[in-house]
Amino acid sequence: MTPGTVQGRIINAPGLQPLFLIGDDETSRRWLHERGAVLEQMQAVGLVVNVATPERLAVVRSWLPNTLVSPASGDDLSQRLGLNHYPVLITPTAIEQ
């Protein structure tokens, strides 16, 4: 997975907790800065791909300190969700950027 444009689409996943997918890159940092308050309000959980070290993970977590952000396998998420790019928000009704 790489930073890039994600085509939004409607999904049907009742009960899914909102989650967002980011990487350790400037595009993801800006996206979080712009949407952080909304993500916190909806209690979204973050998954981060393409993070090289525990130190870099700590930096990424500092971008949105009041939100749970965990490392994840980009390959697995890409296959399961049909995504090639991030950052992206996934809710019970939509995948959107």
Per-region residue spans from a language model:
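Short, surface-exposed patches at the edges or C-terminal ends of soluble domains, predominantly
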Residues: 5, 76, 94-97
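Extracytoplasmic/secreted cell-surface and envelope-processing proteins
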Residues: 56-59, 79-81, 97
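Mid-length scaffold segments of soluble, non-membrane domains
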Residues: 1-59
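A short, hydrophobic beta-strand/beta-hairpin element that forms part of a small beta-sheet core
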Residues: 82, 87-96
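Short hydrophobic alpha-helical runs that function as membrane-insertion/retention elements
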Residues: 47-48, 69-71, 87-90
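Thioredoxin-like thiol-disulfide oxidoreductase module
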Residues: 62-64, 68-84
